[in-house]
Amino acid sequence: MSSCSSLSMDDRVKIGYGSIAGASLSIIGSIGTIILIKIRNKKQEKKLLIQRKQQLSINNLNINSGSSSNIITISNSTTSLSSNNLNIQPPSFPSYSPLPTSISLSNNNNNNKNNNQKTKVSHFIINLSIANLLASIFMITIKLMMIHFNDKFIKVLPSTANHSFNALISVCTIGNGVIGFSFISTFFWTLAISMYIYQQFLSSSTINSNNNNNNINNINNNNNNNINNINNSKNNNSINNFNNSNKSNKIIKMLFYFVCWVIPFVLGSILVSGSRLIELNSDLPWCSIDSNIQLISFYFPLIICLLATTFFTILIKYKFSNDKLACSSSSLINLQSKIIQRLILFLIVILVCWVPSLISFFISFFSKNCKQFLWLEIISSTIQSCQGILNFLSYLSIFKKLKLYFKNLKKKFNNNNSNNSNNSNNNNSNNFNGGGIFYSKGKKVNNQNSNNFYFTFSTFDFDNNQIQEK
């Protein structure tokens, strides 16, 4: 979508093939990301269903055996504390009416609906992958038509032939709009991921703090009314929280859809209106976008999204550093750390893909002769088309695994050169777990959070029930 015409026909062909190569890889990466998320979500749903059935069986067994009087329910189907573990004496009355099975079933159903209706990070990544997929498909189609079907590429539609020159509609001008729409949508969805994760970090800290205070107050109440008060308050709170969160999540979801799809579509339409045909008498006619319109409708939203995503990522990192000192849950710390690592990778991807394009645009924008560098144009066009495949690699944490692999390889090489064979063997056993890049470190591997190398980020739904200590 360059606004200059200083490059030759051969130069534009080279740039076009670079974009086609990068877009082809991005199609593979975008489809792979969507498939992996869908598979992981199915596995998570089956796992949660099994856990709910097991919890329901335990509740029914406790009710039938009469031993449920020693169980204090703290959260819906997720955490239970024994009165013996809390050093609280059981109620002095001989027996009481336990919680009916129907209430347990109702709570399980509410939790299931609540989890399904939560706005999840994996859902945001799917939309980001769809936007990358559309951008790649449009990029390949437009570039191939420009190179091999140029007569149809610049052919003006009959309905617009009698209009002004800048308003001529062709495949070329429409292509500028749809490519711009898709790429702008990727900017907005990347920003949406960082904003949503930051909001979840804040809300999870607040909810956990309130839940802990309420649990302590409820446990310190009169032992005779302790269980009834907790059950009644939690049932009422679960219903109210479900209704409120359901409404708020629907509003948030619709807002994100509007911002990340509708607004980019409007901006893409502006790019179409700002496109014009140039070099009609050359061997490879093409169309360009007015530099001012391109700045306002494309690069200005890009700059805003880059700055905002960086800002929210820094806030999340700062928030995590503060919460880490006060949090005693190692599993929660590991989960939050993985979320931040992948968010940083997504930020790095969008910076790597679009900073060269920004540099190229502003060089031509402020130069008098619309100066362009062929090598910079090829790099920027190729890398920006690779956003989908780079997001896919970030989703798999390939970069971190490669770094760990080469670090361990260096340690292994140093250990082999050491004269102390015992220390060498110990270091090798500590540094390697399976000896390949598709495995985690051998030290302190959390089976619950590191079961599968390929499916990590899709588990970071960060629902309130998931972030509590189990």
From Swiss-Prot:
InterPro entries: GPCR_Rhodpsn, GPCR_Rhodpsn_7TM. The chain crosses the membrane at residues 17-37, 124-144, 177-197, 254-274, 296-316, 343-363, 373-393. It is a multi-pass membrane protein. GO terms for cellular component: plasma membrane. The keyword RNA-binding does not apply. It is found in: Membrane. One of its GO terms (biological process) is adenylate cyclase-activating G protein-coupled receptor signaling pathway. Residues 1-16, 145-176, 275-295, 364-372 are extracellular. Its main location: membrane. Glycans are attached at N162. GO terms for molecular function: G protein-coupled receptor activity. Residues 38-123, 198-253, 317-342, 394-470 are cytoplasmic. Keywords: Disulfide bond, G-protein coupled receptor, Glycoprotein, Membrane, Receptor, Transducer, Transmembrane, Transmembrane helix. Disulfide bonds join C172-C287. Belongs to the G-protein coupled receptor 5 family. Receptor for cAMP. This is Cyclic AMP receptor-like protein D. It comes from Dictyostelium discoideum. The gene is crlD.
